[in-house]
Amino acid sequence: MSLPEKAFPVSWDQFHRDARALAWRLADNGQEWRAMVCITRGGLVPAAIVSRELNIRMIETVCIASYHDYDTQGQMKVLKSISPEIAKDGGEGVLIVDDLTDTGKTAAEVRAMLPRAHFAAVYAKPKGRPLVDTFVTEVSQDTWIYFPWDLGFTYQEPIAKGTRG
């Protein structure tokens, strides 16, 4: 598989630097976070980095599937919601972390669950950008970001094949 014309391949080193840059931006706003909500699966890696840098210990996941194959976004499916304890007060004092906001559909779904939370993503595209409070890099809507966990020397199919949601 060859990369599309507007491809943005991200190495592990680059992603780590960008996630730390996100943590710096969040630290600069002086907010004390009572919890972090990580959007799986893409938000797991930046959440680990940001939670370390900001010393956030209470970490929750929200599991939403929208890409049911590699490159086609489908209907949103909430596989695991947010605990009532984290969701209280509309998510006040909660930091939501994801790798990317693309079309904004996933971000809108999580924003509806936690309307008072702060949404941070490492990368943002124009359609999703209005839903993000803090991000590091904006890329054009027609650029495909290749994250390091998706790549070998070429695109790598997951070991477990088939769609599980």
From Swiss-Prot:
Binding annotation for 5-phospho-alpha-D-ribose 1-diphosphate: R41, G42, D98, D99, L100, T101, D102, T103, G104, K105, T106
Chain residues that bind GMP: D102, T103, G104, K105, T106, W144, I145
Annotated pathway: Purine metabolism; GMP biosynthesis via salvage pathway; GMP from guanine: step 1/1; Purine metabolism; XMP biosynthesis via salvage pathway; XMP from xanthine: step 1/1
Binding residues annotated for Mg(2+), in chain numbering: D99
Alphabetical UniProt keywords: Cell inner membrane, Cell membrane, Glycosyltransferase, Magnesium, Membrane, Metal-binding, Purine salvage, Transferase
Cofactor: Mg(2+)
GO CC list: plasma membrane
Biological process, per Gene Ontology: GMP salvage; purine ribonucleoside salvage; XMP salvage
Its job: Purine salvage pathway enzyme that catalyzes the transfer of the ribosyl-5-phosphate group from 5-phospho-alpha-D-ribose 1-diphosphate (PRPP) to the N9 position of the 6-oxopurines guanine and xanthine to form the corresponding ribonucleotides GMP (guanosine 5'-monophosphate) and XMP (xanthosine 5'-monophosphate), with the release of PPi. To a lesser extent, also acts on hypoxanthine.
Homology family: Belongs to the purine/pyrimidine phosphoribosyltransferase family. XGPT subfamily.
Subunit and partners: Homotetramer.
Name this protein carries in UniProt: Xanthine-guanine phosphoribosyltransferase
Higher taxonomy: Bacteria, Pseudomonadati, Pseudomonadota, Alphaproteobacteria, Hyphomicrobiales
